[in-house]
Amino acid sequence: MILASLLTFATAALAFDCSDKELERYNFESIKGVHSYTTLKNTPPSQTNVTWNVGICQPISAIKDCPANSDICGVTSILRKDEKPVVSEVVSFKSDLQKAYESSDNGIKVIYKGANWGDVLVNAELNFQCDKDSQNNEFTLDQWDGTNLKLSMKTKAACITSKEDKKKEKHDNGESWGWFTWIFIFLVLFLSIYIIGGAWFQYNKGNAIDFQSALKEVVENFIELLKGLPSFGKEIIEKFTGRSNRGEYSAV
């Protein structure tokens, strides 16, 4: 069943945030970061480079010519041979600009309106289209006329996703092995303390000629203890099983 499109205006002035309730149905965490789209045009005697940067679930902060805390930032540079690039235009949609979300089964649009740019107000629309087979996660420029900016991206992140699927898609960062690692470390430490401490105790009691002999004796005792564990466990199981069977017999 196809859901009707919903248009929801953000009530709080926040950055493009993966935790926003309007984005909960999607998995933008999987494409979190700053994405860029660049066009290069020959404008003799120079070239004009226009780069649009979009911060998904994090503001733009590391790009030199972009204002801090921008969600979207466009930088136009004039390139001339043997000369440093000259920045001619910077268009910024700040993180505190109010946004609107237009969502559907086919994806979601994030809409920015009324960003100040010189004497005019400019608008932007990020159109994320659901494509379960897409691996590129790259923006394309649909429109920029000096007033309205439209960028689109075909991505799996824009497909409606359950919480269970989000957990499955998260990359293993090694945390799942943390407990096993710590248990192994503590076990090694415990055995080391047991063996060395036991050897030191035997040596101090005078039961061994030297510390090395005491250490060897403790290790041998420990090995014998390990060998006896299976039979000890078997005996415990047989006792419980035997009691259970006798109990059933008595009940009959």
Swiss-Prot record:
* UniProt superkingdom: Eukaryota
Where is the protein situated, by its record's location annotation? Cytoplasmic vesicle membrane; Golgi apparatus membrane; Mitochondrion membrane; Preautophagosomal structure membrane
SUPFAM superfamilies to which the protein is assigned, alphabetical: Mannose 6-phosphate receptor domain (SSF50911)
Identify the GO cellular component terms for this protein. Answer: cytoplasmic vesicle membrane; Golgi membrane; mitochondrial membrane; phagophore assembly site membrane
Main location class: membrane
Lumenal compartment: which residues? 16-176
Name of the protein in question? Autophagy-related protein 27
Q: Which organism is it from?
A: Candida albicans (strain SC5314 / ATCC MYA-2876) (Yeast)
